[in-house]
Amino acid sequence: MKKISLPKIGIRPVIDGRRMGVRESLEAQTMNMAKATAALISEKLRHACGARVECVIADTCIAGMAESAACEEKFSSQNVGVTITVTPCWCYGSETIDMDPLRPKAIWGFNGTERPGAVYLAAALAAHSQKGIPAFSIYGHDVQDADDTSIPADVEEKLLRFARAGLAVASMKGKSYLSLGGVSMGIAGSIVDHNFFESWLGMKVQAVDMTELRRRIDQKIYDETELEMALAWADKHFRYGEDQNAEQYKRNETQSRAVLKESLLMAMCIRDMMQGNPKLAEKGLVEESLGYNAIAAGFQGQRHWTDQYPNGDTAEALLNSSFDWNGVREPFVVATENDSLNGVAMLMGHQLTGTAQVFADVRTYWSPDAVERVTGQPLTGRAEHGIIHLINSGSAALDGSCQQRDAQGNPTMKPHWEIEQSEADACLAATEWCPAIHEYFRGGGFSSRFLTEGGVPFTMTRVNIIKGLGPVLQIAEGWSVALPKAMHDQLDARTNSTWPTTWFAPRLTGKGPFSDVYSVMANWGANHGVLTIGHVGADFITLAAMLRIPVCMHNVEEAKIYRPSAWAAHGMDIEGQDYRACQNYGPLYKR
């Protein structure tokens, strides 16, 4: 089957169409703007899969309806999912704009004095607003000379932020969310809302009962050679941690081996269900070999599976990581407990950064007073105002141990195309695999256990659905913190020390939900959240605006907030604008 091509970014150079001197004097400058924009994007950005982003430039500058239509025909044939219109001059507004209502679009009007690029920008944006097709405005802060072909830093920042978010929109469109199972323990996020996926993300939901996973395992609908490779890899790299089970629930070596084998098979089969596997076709299993075209998935697990079969912790942890027995590769997005809304936050983070995502329970707020009472030690540094314990049953990406290093040697989580095999091995070495607690998981399993290194910038996110309002997005930028070992051990022992831990300190603003750490926890909309590496809340805000998902909570500096220009017409308070605009325009893929 032919592989689906990646979305491209279309560059639309628009120009003043008056001949006999005007257009002729602008052709080179206008096309050079387009080429510079394409070069910047191709150099700086990659798709989440690691491939370089490809730009498609219109064959000619666009002065009116005919050339605009020719450009659209070219873009339609080359899977252009995002457009950027560029110009250094006055052009004819509504005659030259991109009218596709589903495609994210921006306009860069050159800030120069020789020709009025800003005037076209304003006129074109007015047309977009009047027609109900929002567009993003890009206009440099400082005047440039007409022969200056450089892209100023502020323009570059907006071009790249727009392009990253736009590609995320285009990449999700037409894909599916694989709902493997149903509602887990009454968790609202696992009540999968088909309308949300269809109307806001342009995705389908593929609902599959967990018996399909059982069938694939029992009937050997997998690559048996790969299973042997996976087992050998686990034998080499897995370190086993403490078994906290009572003696009557502990498994012997043979039983533990069977649990490990099934856990690895679950990872293989869930992956095959998501993306397909041509090896299955070689076994005559053509239907199963196709997969479900899933860009994200969720596994119910609890309790209808886990009461008798190994839990999903090992499978989910390995799938969400940037590496496995096949080496370093793009991480998958698999939500624990089929929490589809946390899965969407994971998907957004992965599409924006190319990195693995850390799924976690937003478990406990520890105040400075409570920590000192329990441990006898004060919280200091970034933790001084309190911390949030992010911990779940072991399905977090192993990248979350932060054993990878950036160019300055700091702990981080890299996009998978930058990860060295030695860094993947270091993440594995920092992870213990602890037998699942019988009281929770009667069918057994192994939970990954690691401690995230401190001082790493993270952005925590969550999507929630509010009846009568629709989806909303929460964002909290902050840092992981390293606690003194004795303090960590005491606090960790009070919950479940066989699970992975991140101690998180959000950045406080002194206002609203970020007035203190307690308020961050109190305003969080659900029991789960996602950690994405870096302070990338501004990228999430831009992406949410494209999808018409209002942001109900964030601590991003106002200067970094970048939304379509029409948002400014929806009032003077910037967050109220977001709500009113999202309500006015409705979901991107209205149904």
UniProtKB/Swiss-Prot annotation:
**Gene Ontology biological process terms in this record:** D-arabinose catabolic process; L-fucose catabolic process
Instruction: List, alphabetically, the Pfam families matched.
Output: Fucose_iso_C, Fucose_iso_N1, Fucose_iso_N2
Per the UniProt entry, the Enzyme Commission number(s) are: 5.3.1.25
What are the record keywords, sorted? Answer: Carbohydrate metabolism, Cytoplasm, Fucose metabolism, Isomerase, Manganese, Metal-binding
Q: Active-site positions, per UniProt?
A: 337 (proton acceptor), 361 (proton acceptor)
* InterPro entries associated with the record: Fuc/Ara_isomerase_C (IPR004216), Fuc_iso_dom3_sf (IPR038393), Fuc_isomerase_C (IPR015888), Fucose_iso_dom1_sf (IPR038391), Fucose_iso_N1 (IPR012888), Fucose_isomerase (IPR005763), Fucose_isomerase_dom2_sf (IPR038392), Fucose_isomerase_N/cen_sf (IPR009015)
Q: In which pathway does it act?
A: Carbohydrate degradation; L-fucose degradation; L-lactaldehyde and glycerone phosphate from L-fucose: step 1/3
What compartments host this protein? Answer: Cytoplasm
Annotated Mn(2+) binding lies at 337, 361, 528
GO molecular function list: arabinose isomerase activity; L-fucose isomerase activity; manganese ion binding
Q: Which GO terms describe its cellular component?
A: cytoplasm
Its recorded reaction(s) are: L-fucose = L-fuculose
Per its Swiss-Prot or TrEMBL entry, what cofactor is needed? Mn(2+)
Q: What class of enzyme is it?
A: isomerase
The UniProt record lists the keyword NAD? no
Does the record carry Metal-binding as a key word? yes
Q: Which PANTHER family match?
A: L-FUCOSE ISOMERASE (PTHR37840:SF1)
Question: Which function does this protein serve?
Answer: Converts the aldose L-fucose into the corresponding ketose L-fuculose.
| Record NCBIfam families | fucI, PRK10991.1
- Member of which family? Belongs to the L-fucose isomerase family.
Q: How does it assemble?
A: Homohexamer.
- Please give the name of this protein: L-fucose isomerase
Q: Which organism is it from?
A: Klebsiella pneumoniae subsp. pneumoniae (strain ATCC 700721 / MGH 78578)
